[in-house]
Design a protein with these regions (language model features):
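Positively charged n-region of N-terminal signal peptides that target proteins for export
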Residues: 1-4
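Bacterial N-terminal signal peptides
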Residues: 7-16
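Boundary at the C-terminal end of the N-terminal hydrophobic targeting segment
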Residues: 16-23
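N-terminal targeting signals for Sec/Tat export/insertion, comprising classic cleavable signal peptides
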Residues: 30-53
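Acidic/histidine-rich, surface-exposed loop or edge segments in extracytoplasmic proteins
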Residues: 48-64
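Surface-exposed, polar/charged faces of alpha-helical domains
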Residues: 62, 84, 88-91
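Histidine-anchored nucleotide/phosphate-binding helix
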Residues: 68-87
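Acidic helix-start/capping segments at beta-turn-to-alpha-helix junctions
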Residues: 88-107
């Protein structure tokens, strides 16, 4: 087994620190308050107030146990991010296609 020099690991540890510190900048809302957290982004070009979004999300991989499906959370994040940027919620239309192992993320044993 190869041993890694601490000198090699130091830059990796330095990169991980800012990433974890940035997580505190993420917040949920304005549409979904329990998931779909976003971080503020400095926009160089504002989004048009009448912009229409029609996006499809393909969800086939099951979530980790006791966690929300990452792709479904990405869809919630997409909505939160754009509404926070000023796009009216009524102008955002998502199709979330769920199949394969991800189908189990939509049900629970209590459902049956």
């Amino acid at each position: 087994m190869r041993k890694f020099s601490p000198v090699i690991l130091l830059p990796l540890m330095a990169l991980a620190q800012p990433a974890s510190a940035q997580m505190e900048n993420f917040k949920t809302g304005p549409v979904f308050n329990d998931f779909g957290a976003t971080a503020p982004v400095q926009m160089t070009e504002p989004l048009a107030k009448d912009a229409q979004f029609k996006i499809a999300f393909d969800v086939s991989t099951a979530a980790d146990p006791d966690k929300i499906n990452r792709t479904i959370e990405s869809a919630a994040r997409f909505i939160n991010m754009h509404v926070a940027a000023g796009v009216p919620e009524k102008n955002i239309h998502l199709a979330i296609v769920v199949h394969g192992g991800a189908a189990f993320d939509l049900t629970s044993p209590e459902f049956f």
